């Protein structure tokens, strides 16, 4: 199966499995999710990223030993993705790099949407000259803010602001947007490609999984 | 539907539709294929590429007017892909760039396999530091050569040569390899990811098509 790493600690099974469940529903591949220990707030600065890196590697190595054929680090910042690749022999996919390379396949100007202050470095590096602007929906600091009618309107308004500046593709820099189905809302309202980070990691991971299974 | 451009002129319906048929079978999306006029030998040098470019743009524009939601230039050299993007508003996917970005999502050293003398520039540019070596199976100058048992052995031998040099992903620089099912043979023999150019363009094109259809 696919091993999916959540980079925040949770005992809530629904939260733990939400990305894996989406990938199973979209691509009909088995996903085993697990999370790193002792970081209930996840990764939010350099210090917490340094703290998480060896835990991500340890969990990925364990998942490989457990039989996972493809690993996914399900976070738009791609934490420890390069490091994990040096420690396992199975393919390792990061949400941020998968989404950004998918945008590059389209080759049009990109607007990035997220809820943090800045775009993950890995995404800026990959998007390069296609990157136009980053935006955070007004008043939104948590994905649950987007579940209200007002939050939804703010997300659509933010996407429209990006489009006014010439972007033709939207990329999410937040895996929380996947859980609330924001991509579907924006696609319906605006009729432009929206690259959802969990959809992108799942698209490539499920393709590799099927290959390596001999399907 | 998806509009798929073949960059060689053919009156043979089987040849014309072979990439579209593969994409339909793999991803269950409708594909309309058409080819550029008056180039039965396709693109094989700078002069024939210059000759083909305006024909690709004209065909792509016609396909967009005809209702195609996504266009695919089904050639590993990505001819006229950037030019076509400036002339239509729908997404344009190139086989070479889609396959190369897909390899970058995996992030491991890449070996490229093809039947021409050199790797398309667009693929080298994208693969960058991940590119290790290009190889052409010995004695193979035409994809039909690979349909013989000897040709098949040569392709497997070429892949093994790449792996001995440390590559962990194989990317095809020839869409003819898709038609003969070479990826499946190599995956079975060698158990490493093989990025097939038609599979890669179809993976992204079908995803975008479904998005823009509101699925």
Where does each model-flagged region fall?
Chain A
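N-terminal glycine-rich anion-binding loop in soluble enzyme alpha/beta folds
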Residues: 1-51, 111-150
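General beta-strand structural signal in soluble alpha/beta enzymes
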Residues: 33-34, 72-73, 92-95, 171-172, ...
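Beta-alpha junction/loop-to-helix N-cap segments that form part of ligand/metal-binding clefts
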Residues: 50-83, 87, 174-180
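Short, high-confidence coil segments that cap the C-terminus of an alpha-helix
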Residues: 63, 68-69, 107-108, 167, ...
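Short, acidic/small-residue loops that bind anionic groups at enzyme active sites
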Residues: 85-106, 186-205
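A short beta-strand-loop micro-motif that forms or neighbors metal/cofactor-
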Residues: 98-119, 207, 215
